[in-house]
Amino acid sequence: EALGLTLTVFIEVALNKKDKETRDSFMERIRLWPEVLECHFISGEYDNLLRIVLEDIVAYRKFVLDKLLAIPEVEKTRSSISLGQWKSTTALPLGSA
């Protein structure tokens, strides 16, 4: 937040094709975007889950309309705006099983 990046959004992205070429093309593009902190390849109705951090809702709107939806491989998206973070850790649960 000290850098003015106060908005965290999780965006599910469905691609219009499920082949490797489509996935690779999508990944090549989003790897270039500093707003995208994480991208997970997921199961279910959507193919990818992005975690992005932005300044505000105006920057979010611009990101979705000018970048994400401009990718031809993107069929649809669904976003969830984080209202707060309850837990964040990099520690692995070693020995907890």
Regions found by a protein language model. Give the residues of each.
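A compositional/biophysical signature of low hydrophobicity enriched in polar/charged and small residues
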Residues: 1-97
